[in-house]
Regions:
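Polar/acidic, low-complexity leader/linker segments enriched in S/T/G and N/D
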Residues: 1-19, 209-211, 365-371
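Short alpha-helix capping/helix-loop boundary micro-motifs
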Residues: 37-48, 281-292, 414-420
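Surface-exposed cap/loop segments at beta↔alpha junctions
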Residues: 48-133, 137, 142-146, 158, ...
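Extended, domain-scale alpha-helical bundle/helix-rich regions
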Residues: 85, 114-131, 138, 146-350
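Glycine-rich, acidic and aromatic/proline-enriched surface loops and short helix-turn segments
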Residues: 96-98, 113-135, 257-271, 375-403, ...
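Structural signature for extended repeat/solenoid scaffolds and their inter-repeat hinge/linker regions
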Residues: 175, 183-186, 365-665, 669-672
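Intrinsic-disorder/coil detector with helix-boundary
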Residues: 180-181, 190-193, 635-637, 643-713
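Acidic, low-complexity/disordered segments
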Residues: 309-370, 446-452, 456-467, 700-702
């Protein structure tokens, strides 16, 4: 049975006694990878291939006699072949925890709507770290958008853990090879403390728990933290949280750390400020001690007893340890002072919560390009704030759909309360994405650009003089467009409305066309003028109506023609006047009717001619008077007929024919001359049957049966 201190090392795939440990150095601290450096000797294996050792699990055991005092497990990350004297081979080896693998992978990726446990779990699982435990008591809300950008998985994990106030350490089972990574946000979950007495005797055995040296120190550290941030959803929110440090009796309290942006969007920022404060002051008070016990390592709590300075006899939290073992006799023929073990450790008062100091977040060097995404078949995909989602060129994980990124705000040319400019980037368009404060978690779209598949309007360079704003019909091929062409001598402003165009002017509108103005309307036009309309035409106006024209004037209409007016109606013209109608001609008026003219007067018609009045009828004239007809001639009245002139009244007739005959026929004929009745003829026949019948008036062959009423037309 062995009674002394000894160290052994086993490597998977090799015999348990393949190596003898000459010395080792185990360095551990909270939120860091432990590093175990070993010097080894082997008499069995004078030559080893790297594939037999590297990436294999190795197990260091510290013994006191046959009792295990400590076990450490890790993977071999470095192996060196040393001297070979043909009897034995010296080797050097470095062992690290499985978490060490995370430092070998660098990545660009996006985590969406995941909390810190889910994010870190993904990183650990992908790196083969299966034995780990999250011990969280603080709230850790999900993050809408969290980006790992060019960081190793290890750097990203450490940064995220520090930001969330989480520290980690390796929990070693003392009597077995069980070992796991513990992520913790409170000291309450640390193992129960155990007592270690003060004993300055450095010759105690390893199995004897004691501390031989213990030095307590304090230093000036930041005294307070102020964090501030902004969210567009609550622009008036102060977004500020203050956290004062504790236990600052020995220093001034003016050492403020101001952090912006604080990377929070709500009341959770108070926790961020507190976690930062704990991190900045994690080494404000530190005690450093020495012991031969291997049981003191980060993640454990101890209670110091028996120290001559009474205030040091209290509970402490171990934050770092440096365990060094020497076993020189493992090399045959080499003498030494025997097997030794020293543990230099650091502790802080157990009533303080140790947290890692905040780590710098990578900043983006400049804008990036991305492609707007959305659901399959959708052309425009946005939320109530006009935000869109994009697919970054470096993103290998998220598909190009409605989940490819967080909602990203879009910078517009102008943005006011209910006014400004708005143009939503469409699915498939390439956009330029910048980042607020260089923070990958806060993207913002600052512009758009064309590429080989999304070409510009027009055909460059031929249309290089054109400035164009052209939209595209939603799920269609049409477009609306405003185009300015600055080609010399061909300057043009072009407006195209795919369907409806509405223009609203609340006060005045002036249109000034220096040369020509042409309007073409495919269907109907309606113009409504509430008050007055004035048209001034300098020279000529031509108005052509293809079918019908209706003009309605509510009250009066005045038409003034300075010189001539010609009105031509192809078939029929009807004029209806409600009360009175007057035509005044200053000089000459001529009416020409090619076929028929009809005039109807409901009551009376008067005709006044200042001097002469002439009526010329080519064939026939018919007058029909319902009652009385009266003609009055101031001087002379002449009635002339070329063949037959007849005057009739009932049975009385007076007929004059062209041969000079005069026929007077009536029932009773009375001749009365107040002075004389004279008659002269060679022969006068009275009552002798000499009278001849009165001839009838000839009937014209071209007389129509009756004049039509033109109103029917």
């Amino acid at each position: 049975m062995s009674t002394g201190l000894r160290f052994t090392l086993e490597v998977d795939g090799l015999p348990p006694d393949a190596f003898a440990v000459v010395s080792f150095h185990l360095n551990q601290s909270l939120s860091s990878l432990f590093s175990l450096d070993l010097s080894l000797v082997s008499q069995q294996f004078l030559s080893l291939e790297f594939q037999q050792i590297l990436d294999k699990m190795a197990y260091l055991t510290i013994w006191q006699g046959d009792d295990v005092q400590r076990r450490v497990k890790g993977m071999v990350t470095w192996f060196e072949l040393g001297e070979n004297d043909k009897n034995q081979m010296l080797y050097s080896m470095k062992v690290c925890p499985p978490l060490w693998r995370t430092g070998l992978r660098q990545n660009f990726r996006i985590f969406q709507n995941e909390d810190i446990e889910s994010i870190l779990g993904t990183i650990l699982q992908e790196n083969g770290v299966t034995e780990w435990s999250p011990l969280f008591s603080e709230p850790h809300p999900s993050r809408e958008f969290c980006v790992q950008y060019g960081e190793t998985d290890y750097d990203f994990l450490c940064r995220m853990a520090a930001e969330e106030g989480i520290f980690f350490y390796e929990e070693h089972a003392q009597k077995s090879t069980d070992q796991s990574l513990v992520l913790c946000d409170t000291v309450r979950y640390l193992p129960e403390s155990f007592e270690i007495p003060w004993n300055p005797n450095t010759r105690t055995e390893v199995s004897t728990l004691c501390i031989s040296q213990f030095r307590y120190s304090a230093q000036i550290r930041p005294s307070s933290v102020v964090t501030k941030d902004y969210t567009f959803k609550r622009p008036g929110w102060a977004g500020r949280f203050d956290q004062e440090g504790q236990y600052q009796d020995y220093q001034r309290t003016q050492y403020e750390v101001y952090d912006y942006p604080g990377r929070f969007k709500g009341a959770h920022g108070q926790n961020f400020a507190r976690w930062q404060m704990d991190g900045w002051r994690n080494n404000a008070e530190v005690a450093r001690g020495t012991s031969r016990s291997p049981e003191i390592w980060p993640g454990r709590r101890i209670v110091l007893t028996g120290h001559p300075q009474a205030n040091l006899n209290r509970e402490w939290q171990v934050v770092a340890s440096d365990l060094h073992g020497e076993q020189p006799q493992a090399v045959p023929g080499r003498r030494g002072s025997g097997t030794t073990l020293d543990n230099h450790f650091a502790v802080i008062p157990a009533d303080r919560t140790w947290r890692p100091q905040p780590l710098l977040k990578p900043l983006v060097d400049g804008p990036q390009s991305a492609v707007v995404t959305g659901p399959a078949g959708e052309e425009i995909f946005c939320d109530e704030h006009g935000r869109v989602r994009v697919k970054f060129n470096w993103d290998r994980y998220n598909p190009s759909n409605q989940e490819s990124s967080c909602w990203i705000r879009v910078a517009q040319a102008w943005a006011g309360t209910g006014f400004g400019n708005l143009a939503i980037p469409r699915v498939g368009q390439e956009v330029i994405v910048d980042f607020l404060n260089g923070d990958l978690d806060q993207p913002i779209i600052m512009g758009r650009t064309y590429h080989q598949e999304n070409r510009t309007p027009g055909s460059l360079p031929g249309t290089k003089t054109q400035m164009t704003i052209r939209s595209k019909t939603y799920k269609g091929s049409g477009f609306n467009e405003l185009k300015f062409d600055d080609a010399t001598g061909k300057e043009q402003v072009y407006i195209h409305a795919q369907k409806t165009m509405n223009t609203e002017v609340l006060n005045n509108r002036t249109t000034d066309v220096i040369n020509n103005h042409a309007e073409k309307i495919g269907n109907n036009q309606a113009i409504t003028v509430t008050n007055n309309q004035i048209q001034n035409i300098g020279v000529n106006q031509i108005q052509t109506v293809g079918v019908n024209q209706v003009e309605t004037v509510g009250s009066n209409q005045i038409i003034k023609v300075g010189s001539n007016q010609v009105e031509k109606v192809g078939i029929i013209r009807a004029l209806t006047v409600g009360v009175a109608y007057q035509t005044t001609v200053g000089g000459i008026m001529n009416t020409s009717v090619a076929l028929l003219q009809s005039s109807q007067v409901g009551l009376h018609k008067s005709l006044m001619v200042g001097m002469g009045y002439s009526v010329n009828v080519g064939n026939n004239v018919t007058f029909s008077v319902g009652k009385t007809m009266k003609e009055n001639t101031g001087q002379t009245a002449v009635y002339s007929a070329g063949e037959h002139l007849e005057l009739c009244c009932g049975k009385a007739r007076l007929v004059l024919t062209k041969d000079g005959s005069i026929f007077l026929n009536g029932t009773h004929i009375h001749l009365e001359g107040e002075s004389d009745v004279n008659g002269d003829a060679p022969v006068i026949n009275w009552n002798c049957g000499a009278t001849q019948p009165v001839p009838d008036a000839p009937v014209p062959k071209d007389l129509p049966p009756g004049m039509p009423d033109m109103r029917q037309f």
